[in-house]
């Protein structure tokens, strides 16, 4: 068959042709003005079909369906050059009128004149070519291409339907006929479809040989019904367009094409279509020819509007091969893959079920909660293998001679929370899926700076990566590399790199010479170059192109260097006998997963690579013919968790691998068992940029510029420190952490380096200041004297009540004296009221806002509001005087904000011990502009113990929980208090490394007021539980308790609340014992709360109760706080300080010895005990110990 070609002008030297051919030639020349789309040399060119919009080749009627590419055939018929064509157009037309002519060979005519009503076709008169299609082309002559001829007659005899389209010139309609079924000689049945196009355009596909069958489904056929045909005679289509007379108006069939599948199925996979394009044919002629033939074939009846076809059911055979997976696709992409894919192992059509069936849902996971419970991170649990959630795949056993690891199943599937059968099971499931929350009660906020040496370095070029070794820091990035001294901060060398962009960097291992440790640096670039630089002598050693993509990681493993590029190619560089460890040597390579977001080599010589939140493990010791993957499938953490952004290991926990995530979580995996162990929800929900392990601590840097230090040796984790390490821009701060453990004996300090926005800072990895402060505070009883101080807290939302309302109420008249007597006449009495003025009076609150800006009217408005506070102060003073006959209580401080009022009384004997008294206010209403919501903060010291009392009123509303949380954060962070400048006084009186400028710096904090946290349940259920006095059940829905349990960032998590044993205090009808009966019918809630914070050894609470005062819609509450105030003895403190310093030196020396032992182990591959013996025998001199081991 001749190849389809583009139309062009005929050469002038072309021989004269018969009139019939010249007539066809003129028809084709009229088509040469249309646009042709040239695909390639072997792809057919397609003309723009008339009637399409915007010049596209897709008909309007089929606009919603994609048109498949032309069917490519494996062979072509020679061109018409040299063939004899005789007869006239009229004779050819008469041949088509005769239905008995079985030798009607046709050519394609792409366009017909609109004013012609006759069909101009051509048929060969020679019987020698009756079984071949003839393409008459006006193109230049080309060499004749011979190929197997396709018998049109034999193909027609084996069909059971048609796959043609008739074009009506009058109405310009398309009429899709039924499609034929072609059967091959091999006994296979395969459908061949022709996509219907407007203006009579068809795509013909045929087999390359008579012994092979071609089975290709178009994208349209994938969406249609597939009906199995039987051996019986098919039914007749009453609306068959071919039963109409040419030239008459034919009804348009709206039915989609129907594909008939024979009773025989393919037993062998269909062959891949040949890349050769199909030949052009005269479309209208072939339509008429097939219309005649269709009258001799059994006809098929199809409904005009069939129902929407169901989804195809495909074979569910599982396969790991991408070639076999093509057979499982049920969408239109299967057809494209069969037409264009070079794969040859495609599942045969007989494996594909064509019976419409409703798709089944996947089964639910069958694992239980006990399998998902988080184990404790102990050596006993880590030594035993866990039971997988699902049956593991067969392990991939490697050669026993090489002693390589075996593929391990991974038990990390997500669990279904519905498996929880009880509240305790649900709680355990929350821990597994949502993560446990660290203890933040002892967090310190001061940065761990060094006493001596430089603290930071500002870099004036775009530094992207760094590495540190001893006292040498190397920075690299876009266009340069610099070497700094970490102690002095001086720049020793700057090497310009021009347009070179460094993407990875690491110090080279120096196994052949200990003195070269920290001398040479390897770094990879974006263009795949690997450089070696001598940073001590300031020159380039060598460089080599090892990849055509960026080298993303350069890693060190003992005496080896590992490089990983972006396409997943890992190179392992080992020491050579001639060149040593050099870039110019030949590395061993393996293939890993490309585009790794994190990679690190562990001490068991395995590479852990992360893509997204999937973890892959590779063994580089495998041969090139063997798969390097250790796991049958990657590990992933369970639950809804973000992608992995960083990872690290901790030397004191040899079996644990820690990964940080973009949502602030930290996941833990077992290095030996290849399974997920635990999920930690840190106190920040921002992206973790970097992780570093130091001793028993894990350092985490966040995109906010904050750096957290966790103690992972305890369960739950303890947050030891949090400070603002770097400034964050509007895009965040990408903070990178780095550490050289050997710097503890090389540079005489363990330095953790952080870099963000071209600023490098150095932190004390041992945190000496925090260690000393914590040890000294734990020894307070050794050098301090303690006295008991009791504090009574009374909180009430007065609802704009007046002091006279207390006298009119039965309980109110005796409430304050009864409260003082029942709590044993405490040393300090604090009254905290809310809503002393009507906050719903918009006019009054507006005057209070403008009172400070208006000098004239503001004074009178302020006086009107202040009169309320003055009346309440006088009332409280009179009540306290009535309680104590000898004037025991005096007013310490009285402060007010719009609606808020705090009044503190102390006993006379305690007043002389109080110092550093200060009060301040924090506004949270209207974005901090209005004091209708906010807090009053009172701070004072009793001897050497600091107290802070906070009276607050938070945002109201059942659904405004987030606003209340934000108000708490604003109050605790923005209260402006005077700091303490003396470092000794800071250590003695404040906690967390603070100086007293924040609320959380104080040793005893009490927060009370109308916190407005509600109960998340329905009103009838709440009332029923209150009636039954089932307080514990109702407390399970309390918003404050739920936030403290589940929200890692909740600011009251470090506070303690006494046990609630009374009914909700809100909302009552005024002067009534009935809960809210208004239209809103609010759910009762414990809005009035008292919480405290402090060391359990020095603070406790009791008598947490409510009072039945009906003057407001709230009930007042009170609690008695017991605390111990200390008086530090300076002389005893000095003696204790000397003891603590000696203990610190022992701790630092022990850490230094362990670092040296680990260093010798890595260089010599000896055991821990052997390395310790060599070092102790050489007075812990590393260089002498290495020489002794090598000798």
Swiss-Prot record:
Keyword NAD: no
Extent of Basic residues compositional bias: 302-311
Residue ranges, compositional bias (Polar residues): 1-10, 72-101, 114-135, 151-161, 181-193, 316-334, 367-382, 400-413
GO molecular function: phosphatidylinositol-4,5-bisphosphate 5-phosphatase activity
Annotated spans, Disordered: 1-193, 205-281, 294-334, 355-425
Keywords carried by this UniProt record: Cytoplasm, Hydrolase, Phosphoprotein
Positions bearing Phosphoserine: 195
Family listed: Belongs to the inositol 1,4,5-trisphosphate 5-phosphatase family.
Record-given protein name: Probable inositol polyphosphate 5-phosphatase C9G1.10c
Organism: Schizosaccharomyces pombe (strain 972 / ATCC 24843)
């Amino acid at each position: 068959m001749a190849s389809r070609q583009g139309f062009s002008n005929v050469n002038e030297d072309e021989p004269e042709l018969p009139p019939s051919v010249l007539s066809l030639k003129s028809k084709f020349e009229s088509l040469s003005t249309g646009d042709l789309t040239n695909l390639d040399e072997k792809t057919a060119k397609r003309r723009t079909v008339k009637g399409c919009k915007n010049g596209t080749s897709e008909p309007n009627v089929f606009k919603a369906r994609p048109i498949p590419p032309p069917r490519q055939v494996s062979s072509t018929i020679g061109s018409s050059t040299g063939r004899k064509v005789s007869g006239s157009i009229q004779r050819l037309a008469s041949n088509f009128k005769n239905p008995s002519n079985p030798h009607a060979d046709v050519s394609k005519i792409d366009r017909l004149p609109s004013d012609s009503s006759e069909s101009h076709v051509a048929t060969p008169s020679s019987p020698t070519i009756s079984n071949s299609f003839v393409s008459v082309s006006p193109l230049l002559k080309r060499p004749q291409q011979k190929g197997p001829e396709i018998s049109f007659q034999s193909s027609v005899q084996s069909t059971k339907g048609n796959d043609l389209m008739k074009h009506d010139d009058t109405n310009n309609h398309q009429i899709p006929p039924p499609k034929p079924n072609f059967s091959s000689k091999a006994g296979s049945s395969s459908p061949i479809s022709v996509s219907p196009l407007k203006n009579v355009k068809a795509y013909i596909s045929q087999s390359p040989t008579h012994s092979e069958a071609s089975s290709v489904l178009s994208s349209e056929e994938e969406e249609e019904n597939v009906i199995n045909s039987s051996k019986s005679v098919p039914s007749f289509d009453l609306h068959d367009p071919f039963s109409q007379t040419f030239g008459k108006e034919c009804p348009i069939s709206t039915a989609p094409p129907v594909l008939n599948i024979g009773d025989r199925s393919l037993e062998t996979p269909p062959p891949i279509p040949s890349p050769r394009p199909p030949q052009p044919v005269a479309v209208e002629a072939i339509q008429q020819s097939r219309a005649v033939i269709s009258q001799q074939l059994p006809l098929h009846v199809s409904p005009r509007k069939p129902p929407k076809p169901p989804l195809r059911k495909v074979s569910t055979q599982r396969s790991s091969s991408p070639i076999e997976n093509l057979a499982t696709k049920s969408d239109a992409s299967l057809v494209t893959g069969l037409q264009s894919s070079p794969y040859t192992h495609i599942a045969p059509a007989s494996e594909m079920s064509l019976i419409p069936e409703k798709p089944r849902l996947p089964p639910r996971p069958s694992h239980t909660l006990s399998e998902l419970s988080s184990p404790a991170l102990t050596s006993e649990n880590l030594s035993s293998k866990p039971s997988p959630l699902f049956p593991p795949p067969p392990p991939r056993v490697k050669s026993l001679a090489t002693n390589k690891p075996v593929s391990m199943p991974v038990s990390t599937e997500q669990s279904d929370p519905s498996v929880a059968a009880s509240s305790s099971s649900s709680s355990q499931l929350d821990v597994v899926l949502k993560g446990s929350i660290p203890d933040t009660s002892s967090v310190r906020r001061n940065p761990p700076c060094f006493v001596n040496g430089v603290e930071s370095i500002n870099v004036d070029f775009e530094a992207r990566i760094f590495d540190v070794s001893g006292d040498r820091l190397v920075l690299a990035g876009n266009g340069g590399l610099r070497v700094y001294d970490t102690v002095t901060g001086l720049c020793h060398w700057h090497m310009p790199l021009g347009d070179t962009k460094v993407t990875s960097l690491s110090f080279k291992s120096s196994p052949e010479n200990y003195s070269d440790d920290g001398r040479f640096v390897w770094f990879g670039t974006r263009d795949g170059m690997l450089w070696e630089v001598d940073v001590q002598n300031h020159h380039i050693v060598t460089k080599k192109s090892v990849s055509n993509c960026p080298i993303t990681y350069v890693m060190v493993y003992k005496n080896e260097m590992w490089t990983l590029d972006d396409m997943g190619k890992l190179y392992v560089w080992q020491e050579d006998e001639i060149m040593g460890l050099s870039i110019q040597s030949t590395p061993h390579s393996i293939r890993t997963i490309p585009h790794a977001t994190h990679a690190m080599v562990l001490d068991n010589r395995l590479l852990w690579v992360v893509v997204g939140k999937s973890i892959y493990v590779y063994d580089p010791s495998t041969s090139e013919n063997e798969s390097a993957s250790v796991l049958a499938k990657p590990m992933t953490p369970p639950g809804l968790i973000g992608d992995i952004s960083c990872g690290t290991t901790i030397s004191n926990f040899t079996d644990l691998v820690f990964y940080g995530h973009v949502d602030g979580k930290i996941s833990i995996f077992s290095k030996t068992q290849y399974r997920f162990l635990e999920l930690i929800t840190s106190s920040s929900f921002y992206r973790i940029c970097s992780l570093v392990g130091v001793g028993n601590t894990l350092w985490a840097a966040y995109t906010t510029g904050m750096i957290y230090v966790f103690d992972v040796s305890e369960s739950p984790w303890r947050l030891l420190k949090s400070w603002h390490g770097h400034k964050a821009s509007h895009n965040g701060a990408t903070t990178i952490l780095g550490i050289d453990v050997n710097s503890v004996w090389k540079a005489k300090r363990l330095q953790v380096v952080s870099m963000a926005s071209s600023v490098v800072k150095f932190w004390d990895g041992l945190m000496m200041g925090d260690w000393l402060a914590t040890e000294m505070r734990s020894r307070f009883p050794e050098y301090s004297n303690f006295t008991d101080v009791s504090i009574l807290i009374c909180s009430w939302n007065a609802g704009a009540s007046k002091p006279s309302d207390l006298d009119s109420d039965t309980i109110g008249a005796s409430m304050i004296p009864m409260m003082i007597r029942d709590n044993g006449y405490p040393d300090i009495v604090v009254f905290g009221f809310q809503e002393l003025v009507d906050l719903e009076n918009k006019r009054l609150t507006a005057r209070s806002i403008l009172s400070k800006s208006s000098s004239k009217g503001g004074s009178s408005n302020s006086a009107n509001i202040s009169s309320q506070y003055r009346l309440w102060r006088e009332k409280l003073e009179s009540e306290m005087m009535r309680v104590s006959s000898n004037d025991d209580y005096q007013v310490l401080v009285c402060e007010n904000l719009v609606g808020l009022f705090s009044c503190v009384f102390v006993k006379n004997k305690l007043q002389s011990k109080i110092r550093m008294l200060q009060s301040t206010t924090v506004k949270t209403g209207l974005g901090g502009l209005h004091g209708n919501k906010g807090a009053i903060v009172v701070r004072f010291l009793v001897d050497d113990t600091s107290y802070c009392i906070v009276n607050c009123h938070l945002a109201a509303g059942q659904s405004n929980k987030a606003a209340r949380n934000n108000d708490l954060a604003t109050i605790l962070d923005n209260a402006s208090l005077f700091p303490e400048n003396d470092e000794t006084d800071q250590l003695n009186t404040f906690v967390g490394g603070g100086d007293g400028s924040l609320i959380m710096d104080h040793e005893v904090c009490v927060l009370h007021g109308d916190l407005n946290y509600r109960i998340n349940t329905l009103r009838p259920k709440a009332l029923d539980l209150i009636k039954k006095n089932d307080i514990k059940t109702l407390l399970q829905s309390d918003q404050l308790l739920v936030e403290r349990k589940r929200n890692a960032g909740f600011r009251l998590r470090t506070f303690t609340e006494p046990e609630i044993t009374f009914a909700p205090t809100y909302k009552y009808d005024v002067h009534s014992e009935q809960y809210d009966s208004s239209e809103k019918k609010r759910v009762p809630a414990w809005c009035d709360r008292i919480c405290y914070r402090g060391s359990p050894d020095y603070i406790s609470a009791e008598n947490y109760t409510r009072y039945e005062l009906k003057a407001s819609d709230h009930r007042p509450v009170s609690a008695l706080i017991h605390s111990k105030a200390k008086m530090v003895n300076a002389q005893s403190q000095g003696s204790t300080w000397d003891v603590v310093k000696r203990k610190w030196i022992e701790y630092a020396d022990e850490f230094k010895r362990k670092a040296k032992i680990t260093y010798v182990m890595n260089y010599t591959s000896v055991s821990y005990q052997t390395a310790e013996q060599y070092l102790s025998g050489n007075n812990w001199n590393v260089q002498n110990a290495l020489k002794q081991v090598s000798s």
